[in-house]
Amino acid sequence: MIRYLFISVLIFIISCSDKKQPVDISVIRDSINAISTNKKMVKIDSGSYQAFYGKDSGNIVRVKAFYLDETAVTNAEYLKFLKANPQWTRNNVLRLKADENYLKNWKSDFEIPEGVSPDAPVTNVSWFAAVAYAKSVGKRLPTVDEWEFAALADEHTANASLKPEFTAYILNSYQKKYKYKKPVKQNRPNYYGLYDMYGVVWEWTEDFSSVMMTRESRNDKSENEGLYCAAGALTSSDLRNYAAFMRFALRGSIQANYCINNLGFRCAKDID
């Protein structure tokens, strides 16, 4: 637990030292060729949860019903996207939209990494790339609130946040290494039918850069410095906060063009 606290505080310091502007999804103006997908999505019914970040911390947030992919996007699925949209291959992508680590382990533009399952989550992809993929399949990335709300579920209940064993499972899953090389669906699904919300890869969200802002300032796109840094007042007695803090610290410390070895994504969709 001390190691977790150290890692969290380290990321927290990095995130608080970086004045970030929220990323505007409208910057993705490239022409994207659509691809077909038969990936199963599950319905997440509307509800509420206790938010963790900024001035929303401790507040009850309402989440509308939405659809969410049952698994993270896989290497095979992303390869199909690349073949239809070669401007997003490793050798063609703009550095503005993906750093030098983009798909760094792929053997070539159209060959997935050696020793990694085609059905494993694609990683080393930027937020821009994830948004482009989602656009190609007629979807979007989930919001922070949607992801956090869906991730409250264990195998049996929609909200397991008060179960000590669930918190222990989450924290333990964060210690596992190289899970991103294995196929999805290796663990049992949660209450909704979602696989691998923990312990395989971290996942991009549409509004990941909003963690340093209040809900009000997110709405008007204005900057609000230091609000997220108030999370440093977390007490060591609340393990649930540690788990949430690790996720929000990561989101607060990355930029949209970052590509990380264990960071992938899954897609969401509005309910018409």
Listing of model-derived features with the role each one plays in the protein:
Residues 2-7:
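Sec-dependent signal peptide recognition
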Residues 260-272:
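Short, structured beta-strand segments at or near domain termini in extracellular proteins/domains
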Residues 50, 108-252, 256, 261:
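Functional-site microenvironments in short loops/helix caps that host divalent-cation chemistry
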Residues 19-38:
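Sec-dependent signal peptide cleavage junction
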Residues 29-32, 55-58, 250-256:
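Short, P/G- and charge-enriched loop/turn segments at secondary-structure junctions
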Residues 32-99, 125-126, 199:
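A short glycine-rich, aromatic-capped structural motif
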Residues 73, 207-209, 272:
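Acidic glycine-/aspartate-rich tracts in secreted/extracellular proteins
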Residues 14-15:
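C-terminal motif of bacterial Sec signal peptides marking the signal peptidase cleavage site
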